[in-house]
Every structure is written in structure tokens, then in C-alpha cells.
Amino acid sequence: FLKDLKLYESDEKIPLLKDLLVEISGKIPLVIEIKKHKNIGILENKLVDLLENYKGKYLICSFEKNILFWFKKNKPNLKRGLIFESNPKKFEKYNKTLFLYKYYKSRADFISLDYKLLDSSIYDFCVKNSLDLITWTIRNKENFEKVKEKVDAVIFESLFKL
């Protein structure tokens, strides 16, 4: 099913992960995000099997603490990251509480933080606790300039001239 879908406004098809792994052949590190789903363990086991012989570097990340905890329990040497974004305006006051809950439940190795939270107490917590930080999603040079000294890595949505 997925292999027949086309990328938005193009003739390019969405590659399967197994094909992508062969294509890049370890040339670049991968950040693999696992979206929320039911039956935690089934998809994760399939992913572990798929990555077993992959020679390149990769990280697993998710918004979901239970997915990350599954990897902590079943693949403890695999680096796992908690993705966190700000809550809607009326719930912003709960950001740090929710973050701390997810962080301590997931036992994440690094944090992938929405760039809008880089001036928050969540960012301060990460720095104080020497957590590796990735930020997302940077779409222009101005935002890149603001964040580049604060984080260990940046996720871009589109390319722009640095």
C-alpha cells in the first residue's frame, strides 16, 4: 500500500524503510520517529529486526513515553529520544509537569524539543541535567541562527542557504 503512494505534488513514491536502508547504506545517520499506535511491541519488534544488520548509525524517537520505555526494556543499548512540543495555549502552564512525567517514564537518552521551547524551564532542565538536545522544525535561516548554539542537532523541514 505505502509503496504505491506518491509524495505531495510529485511523481516520487514513498520508499519503504527496508529500501531506504539499502539506498543510504549507512552514509548518513538516521533519526527514526515512531508515531503513536496501539499494541506497543509489534511494530517495535519489526523495526528491531529490520535494523539488526544495518551498519549505519540511528536513533529512535517518539512523543510516546511507552514506546520509548519498550526500547529501554528490550533494546537498552539503543539511543532513544523523547520528542516534546508545547501544549495549546490554555494548557501551557502544564508543559513542564507533562514533560517531566514523560521524561521520567520514558527514560529517554536525549530530548527532541520544539524550538519554541528553547527559552523555557524545560530547556533549562535539559541543560542542567546534561541531556543531549535536538530541536525541530527549523524552516528558515533566522530561526537556525537563534538555535544553533543552544542544541546538539537541528531538524530542518526544508533546505535554505546557510
Where are these predicted regions, by residue range?
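C-terminal active-site rim and adjoining tail of enzyme catalytic domains
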Residues: 12, 83-85, 90-162
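Metal-dependent phosphodiesterase/phospholipase catalytic core, i.e.
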Residues: 1-88, 106-109, 113-116
